[in-house]
Amino acid sequence: MRQTKTGILLANLGTPDAPTPEAVKRYLKQFLSDRRVVDTPRLLWWPLLRGVILPLRSPRVAKLYQSIWMDGGSPLMVYSREQQQALAARLPDTPVALGMSYGSPSLESAVDELLASDVDHIVVLPLYPQYSCSTVGAVWDELGRILARKRRIPGISFIRDYADDGAYIDALAKSARESFARHGEPDLLLLSYHGIPQRYADEGDDYPQRCRDTTRELVSALGLPPEKVMMTFQSRFGREPWLTPYTDETLKMLGEKGTGHIQVMCPGFAADCLETLEEIAEQNREIFLEAGGKKYAYIQALNATPEHIDMILKLTAPYR
């Protein structure tokens, strides 16, 4: 009997191919056209997206990407490739593919790559520690569309999230401790998660609870008193209310109140990207310092650290 051959698909959001208005426009069009991301009725959304948002937003976002672009591409792509390569090196007999919900490499190209390696079973790991319909749900939807077009469908194991997984929490705690050792222990550790519309949570998305689960476990692992940790939400988009408190408004308030030293971690990002390196490490640093804060440090995402690769190995082990 033929032994089952398993492959691993690491999934993430995606990135423009280049820091140019044209490339950013292509990427944003695909991203903001997904109903999992924006569910505004299409008759209202298409004219707004194509006539206002894409023309105005693309040049501005391209400049932000230019400020963080690396020799190998966007930070998200560079670190995601490093994750893929590091995992493949630890699992020489297991094909590992990388796929993005938007942009390239696509999820479909990742599935095709694994099927070309003659796998019978694919372990899908969306690199979103906290489930949300707008991230993990988008991977699930696209995977279904891809497989619906295939004659041969492999077995699928889909890891929904890992918000309170022990190896994940340990990796975050180690990263925080290293930052404390480098910069000194802060007056406050701010845990900034990507926001979602409040309405999504009201309609059943358990993302806020999964963020609270991560925060609870990380605070416990670090042994910090609750008053030295805050949880906030960043990157809001549009006019409807999003999860609160907002990161930028909180940092301004803390600076004005006299909080001297803050360190910020973004536990929901598996790889550094525009939202961490530009929004948190740069924009929000300025907000805090201009409001009266004295010291601000951003704690990098787990990226391709050995602890992060160990975590991925442990998460996928039961399905390999």
UniProtKB/Swiss-Prot annotation:
InterPro entries: Ferrochelatase, Ferrochelatase_AS, Ferrochelatase_C, Ferrochelatase_N
CDD domains: Ferrochelatase_C (cd00419), Ferrochelatase_N (cd03411)
E.C. numbers: 4.98.1.1
Keyword annotations from UniProtKB, A to Z: Cytoplasm, Heme biosynthesis, Iron, Lyase, Metal-binding, Porphyrin biosynthesis
GO molecular function: ferrochelatase activity; metal ion binding
Entry GO terms, CC: cytoplasm
Keyword DNA damage: no
Catalytic activity: heme b + 2 H(+) = protoporphyrin IX + Fe(2+)
Top-level enzyme category: lyase
UniProt GO BP: heme biosynthetic process
Biological pathway: Porphyrin-containing compound metabolism; protoheme biosynthesis; protoheme from protoporphyrin-IX: step 1/1
Residues given in the record as Fe cation binding sites: H194, E275
Location(s), subcellular: Cytoplasm
Subunit structure: Monomer.
Protein name: Ferrochelatase
